[in-house]
Amino acid sequence: MRVLIIGGSIAGLTLAHCLEKAKIDYVLLEKKEEIAPQEGASIGILPNGGRIMEQLGLYHQIEQLIEPLARAHVTYPDGFHFTSQYPALLQQRFGYPLAFLDRQKLLQILAAGPVQSGRVKLGHQVVNIESTPDGVTVRTSHGHVYQGDLVVGADGVHSRVRAEMWRLATASQGEIFRSEYNKLTIDYACIFGISSPVDQLEPGEQITCYNDGWSILSVIGQNGRVFWFLFIKLDKESVYDGSRKNGPRFSPADARAHCERLAHEPVWNGVKFGHVWAQCEVFQMTPLEEGLFSKWYWRNIVCIGDSMHKFAPHIGQGANCAIEDAAQLSNRLQAWLYGCGPNDPPTASDLSEILAGFVEDRLRRLGPVAVAARSAMRLHARQGVKNWILGRYLLPYAGDKPADWASQGIAGGGVTLDFVEPPERSGPGWVQFSQPRKRPTFPLTVAGLCLVAIVIRMLHSTLTV
């Protein structure tokens, strides 16, 4: 079996490592000339991604570049704030810290082995894919031709592989992907950046600033570097078809205008956003696509990572779920290979069975994650009365419940490589939070208390007028 991976993303490079472990032949085609450019992005590695990285022998390199999160601060426009120890609690439960680092650094770690092996081809932009019952052929803009048994699109939210898959399927079977065309929507934009250390912001802190129509998420990493995100609600929601033609676009000037407008807003411990902005090393503004596709494959083409699921960054699961995609697909391919032998190419029926099982696994896992990420972004921006109430009057008094909800997202349906030794690190949370739970009564109880609090506040306002 030979796999053609399109895209040197976190999903694509993780898949390369997984296939190497599974002894499956592959080549990875990346359109950029540089595998790990500095684009101002940071990445969070949660326990569910961390344990796969450990199985691949990469986690120790990641760990050298991170400052484990120990505490989380949350602030509100009225000056109220609270601190939670949930990051430390999650580490106790799962054996891995919540880790943030430069996305560039993670890509460098992931790319080192595959690049050295000669299996990564840079500057290879895919322009055409041809699918037959006997295999698949990929052509690049420079005229290179690659053949294999399976194409895996790991080329991001603007995926060329996804577009080619839709084109080929439509030509062969009509509009079988029509229901997928409107799956991605854009309701928010994000300015993300990395700043040099700021006095009064301590390594190991996460700071979330709730506001009306916007929010700020900051993580203080190793040596005090500040990884920050400014989320802004757009005037209207739009549908994104994946072609780059109909989505909103933003310039560096747009980003600067927003950051300067909010420079006076408090972050934490006397620090204002302007202090963070003044130390900014690199930044970028982008629309935030949200959505989960339900059809991931057609014949011998399959897509993974951001090309199939795009989440708001608030719960940190985007990259981790992409890592899981790579591991889950590798599990399915390796199991087939183990049963059939390394020299037998998969038939169309084989691939259909492999990929159908893979997609079923992933959709079961990712549905709740998509809902949680979408809800979190709107909660932080206090979008609507419900989110205003929940954010201000429920979360500060929820105790360990946010850690429990995060634990269910980490452990529920998480993946490891079946054909590699289990990760050495562990914790009770993997078993404790792995099964779906009954709907808790706690949120309903607190919601009732919130209603009482609002009534009291209204009465107080009336009496003091």
Curated annotation (Swiss-Prot):
Q: What is its main location?
A: membrane
Molecular function (GO) terms for this protein are: FAD binding; monooxygenase activity
Q: Which reaction does it catalyse?
A: 4-hydroxy-3-[(2E,6E)-farnesyl]-6-(pyridin-3-yl)-2H-pyran-2-one + NADPH + O2 + H(+) = 2-oxo-3-[(8S)-epoxy-(2E,6E)-farnesyl]-6-(pyridin-3-yl)-2H-pyran-4-olate + NADP(+) + H2O
Query: Where are its TM segments located?
Result: 440-456
Signal peptide start and end residues: 1-16
The processes (GO biological process) annotated in the record are:
secondary metabolite biosynthetic process; terpenoid biosynthetic process
Please tell me how industry or biotechnology makes use of this protein: Pyripyropene A and its derivatives have very unique characteristics of selectively inhibiting the acyl-coenzyme A:cholesterol acyltransferase 2 (ACAT2) isozyme. Therefore, pyripyropenes are expected to be developed as a new type of anti-atherosclerotic agent. Furthermore, pyripyropenes have been shown to exhibit anti-angiogenic activity against human umbilical vein endothelial cells. Finally, pyripyropene A also exhibits insecticidal properties.
Listed pathway(s): Secondary metabolite biosynthesis; terpenoid biosynthesis
Q: What positions does UniProt annotate as the active site of this protein?
A: 210
Entry protein name: FAD-dependent monooxygenase pyr5
Gene (name only): pyr5
